[in-house]
From Swiss-Prot:
Known function: Catalytic component of the GATOR1 complex, a multiprotein complex that functions as an inhibitor of the amino acid-sensing branch of the mTORC1 pathway. In response to amino acid depletion, the GATOR1 complex has GTPase activating protein (GAP) activity and strongly increases GTP hydrolysis by RagA/RRAGA (or RagB/RRAGB) within heterodimeric Rag complexes, thereby turning them into their inactive GDP-bound form, releasing mTORC1 from lysosomal surface and inhibiting mTORC1 signaling. In the presence of abundant amino acids, the GATOR1 complex is ubiquitinated and inhibited by GATOR2. Suppresses Src-dependent tyrosine phosphorylation and activation of PDPK1 and its downstream signaling. Down-regulates PDPK1 kinase activity by interfering with tyrosine phosphorylation at 'Tyr-9', 'Tyr-373' and 'Tyr-376' residues. May act as a tumor suppressor. Suppresses cell growth and enhances sensitivity to various anticancer drugs.
Organism: Bos taurus
Originating gene: NPRL2
Keyword annotations of the record: GTPase activation, Isopeptide bond, Lysosome, Membrane, Methylation, Tumor suppressor, Ubl conjugation
Site feature (Arginine finger) residues: 124
Keyword Membrane in record: yes
Crosslinked residue numbers (Glycyl lysine isopeptide (Lys-Gly) (interchain with G-Cter in ubiquitin)): 158, 357
UniProt-recorded name of the protein: GATOR1 complex protein NPRL2
Sequence positions that bind GDP: 78
SUBUNIT field: Within the GATOR complex, component of the GATOR1 subcomplex, made of DEPDC5, NPRL2 and NPRL3. GATOR1 mediates the strong interaction of the GATOR complex with small GTPases Rag (RagA/RRAGA, RagB/RRAGB, RagC/RRAGC and/or RagD/RRAGD) heterodimers. GATOR1 interacts with GPR155/LYCHOS; interaction takes place in presence of cholesterol and prevents interaction between GATOR1 and KICSTOR. Interacts with PDPK1.
Gene Ontology CC annotation, any one: GATOR1 complex
């Protein structure tokens, strides 16, 4: 499990009929000081309105996550059993991924108590110490844990890392599969996604996919955003031979990383051709520069491109951040209304976006802007 949510301590707290709230067990021992527990105990053994709810509290540079449980029955002292099995992490840790684990453990212990008085019986309750020890070690080591409680009960737990929100898929973005396309043609996806999958080829942009698949644009964007979330696709810009690219510092990884070399050469070699050489591919990437279009690259390096598919060369470079696109952004420098559509000429909208929104081709847009003295082009 990532260090961002490493568990420093697991504790079991309960309400004692005479002593009140107390920590019965903790692993490692004495991790939670008396001062810390006194500060947070009202959130560990709580009032009824907070029971059976996930609670995260930060105090004294520690973050405690728990789910206080209350089981009411006349067999218990004061007619209720109150307990909490929780985790302690660093105050700065991102603990969202641990919350479902804490909630699930609270549910398991509640079930075990209702079925066999596991928590309220001293003999069985003592089994919590080795259980907590295994939990701490295995969740920190691998993010998953299997806990045999008794002959008929086993608990399976897994930390599901929270993925960041994917970027918004714009109509001018081009989705590219991150793995073999054929792996994803199955019924695990919703109907909209199944309908657009055949049109994702790494070259069609979102708007074109929408038109050719006959699916409403916003539905296509939502479906692609879902694929982005699960890492099935990534986004690159529209490929045209007038595009300009330049290498990033990561292009050096192509020399140092053997697995990246293998993936790159397999990806960019023309179908049915002899395998491309690393020397040729690296030279092609390094030949990209401001002012050099893809068309220029093809004209200057026919020998190196004998076995290299230039479209896949660009595509792979963008996917792996070996290269980046330099895009043109029109900026209107006066209020002349002839600069229509003026709202798109602010320096914030690329040629890709403007062409998708207006239906103009790159050539048409270029001709229009070249003849407009009130427009300058910013490359970035």
């Amino acid at each position: 499990m990532g260090s961002s949510c490493r568990i420093e301590c697991i504790f079991f707290s309960e309400f004692h009929p005479t002593l009140g709230p107390k920590i019965t067990y903790q692993v490692p021992e004495d991790f939670i000081s008396r001062e810390l527990f006194d500060t947070v105990q009202v959130y560990i053994i709580t009032k009824p309105e907070l029971q059976n709810k996930l609670i995260t509290v930060t105090a004294m540079e520690k973050k405690l996550i728990g789910c206080p449980v209350c089981i009411e029955h006349k067999k218990y002292s004061r007619n209720a059993l109150l307990f909490n099995l929780g985790f302690v992490c660093d105050a700065q840790a991102k603990t969202c991924a641990l919350e479902p684990i804490v909630k699930k453990l609270a549910g398991y212990l509640t079930t075990l108590e209702l079925e066999s008085s596991f928590v309220s019986t001293e003999e069985s309750k003592q089994k919590l110490v080795p259980i907590m020890t295994i939990l701490l070690e295995e969740l920190n080591a691998s993010g998953r844990c299997t806990l045999p409680i008794d002959e008929s009960n086993t608990i399976h737990l897994k930390v599901i890392e929270q993925r960041p929100d994917p970027p918004v898929a714009q109509e001018y973005d081009v989705p590219v599969f991150t793995k073999d396309k054929e792996d994803f043609f199955n019924s695990q996806w919703d109907l909209t996604t199944q309908q657009i999958l055949p049109y994702i080829d790494g070259f069609r942009h979102v708007q074109k996919i929408s038109a050719e698949a006959d699916v409403e644009l916003n539905l296509v964007r939502i479906a692609i955003q879902n694929l982005l979330y699960y890492g099935v696709v990534t986004l690159v810009s529209i490929l045209q031979y007038s595009n300009v690219y330049c290498p990033t510092p990561k292009v050096q990884d192509l020399v140092d990383d053997k697995s990246l070399q293998e993936a790159c050469l397999s990806y960019v070699t023309k179908e049915g051709h002899k395998r491309a050489s690393l020397r040729d591919v690296f030279q092609l990437y390094c030949s990209l520069s401001p002012g050099t279009t893809v068309r220029d690259l093809i004209g200057r390096h026919p020998q190196q491109l004998q076995h290299v598919d230039e479209r896949k060369l660009i595509q792979f470079g963008l996917m792996k951040n070996l290269i980046r696109r330099l895009q043109k952004y029109p900026v209107r420098v006066s209020r002349d209304e002839r600069s229509h559509p003026a709202r798109l000429y602010t320096g914030c909208h690329s040629y890709d976006e403007i062409c998708c929104k207006t239906g103009m081709s790159y050539q048409e847009l270029d001709e229009r802007l070249e003849n407009d003295p009130n427009i300058i082009i910013c490359w970035k």
